[in-house]
From Swiss-Prot:
CDD domains, alphabetized: HFD_CHRAC1-like
Assembly behavior: Interacts with DREB2A in the nucleus during heat-stress. Component of a heat stress-inducible transcriptional complex with NF-YA and NF-YB subunits made, at least, of NFYA2, NFYB3 and DPB3-1 in cooperation with DREB2A. Binds directly with NFYB1, NFYB2, NFYB3, NFYB6, NFYB7, and DPB4. Binds to GAPC in response to heat-stress; this interaction promotes DNA-binding ability to its target promoter.
Organism: Arabidopsis thaliana
Record's protein name: DNA polymerase II subunit B3-1
GO CC terms, sorted: nucleus
InterPro entries in UniProt: CBFA_NFYB_domain, Histone-fold, Transcr_DNA_Rep_Reg
GN (gene name): DPB3-1
Family: Belongs to the NFYC/HAP5 subunit family.
Amino acid sequence: MVSSKKPKEKKARSDVVVNKASGRSKRSSGSRTKKTSNKVNIVKKKPEIYEISESSSSDSVEEAIRGDEAKKSNGVVSKRGNGKSVGIPTKTSKNREEDDGGAEDAKIKFPMNRIRRIMRSDNSAPQIMQDAVFLVNKATEMFIERFSEEAYDSSVKDKKKFIHYKHLSSVVSNDQRYEFLADSVPEKLKAEAALEEWERGMTDAG
């Protein structure tokens, strides 16, 4: 005999709780979702502040600033015993050449090779010792210094601030020591005076 009674439907346990006040449903068993904040934490870089005591001198402040500049430069940074860094600039090849040239110029003022080349222009002296070239170099230097000083004295007498050609020629014409330069540094003459001198020379020769 078949029973006409319908099986009782099992009521599903509702895990939904109705909030009467708001009318919204919330799951009691479900975990509440936490809203993550989209705020980005911005870290502000604080400016560097140097604390200087009243007893510190200005020299220590300058050394600290130099130490910071040395770190930014391309030089080598070395640390002292007190922890301060000091920049040591590296020497380039150009600076080394200038230093070597300065050491050589302290002894002589004219290139030795050029003096040797001038001395070798005469075939009578094919071999020249280094000390002879050095002495000729120093003698040339002393001669030019003495000649320039006397030309300067001549410009002072002429009330001029610069040395002109006439001052050099006056030194050559007035001093017998420079007579060998008479053909190289002759006095400037006007055309009329030069013509009279030439005619006088021709009459004396005739």
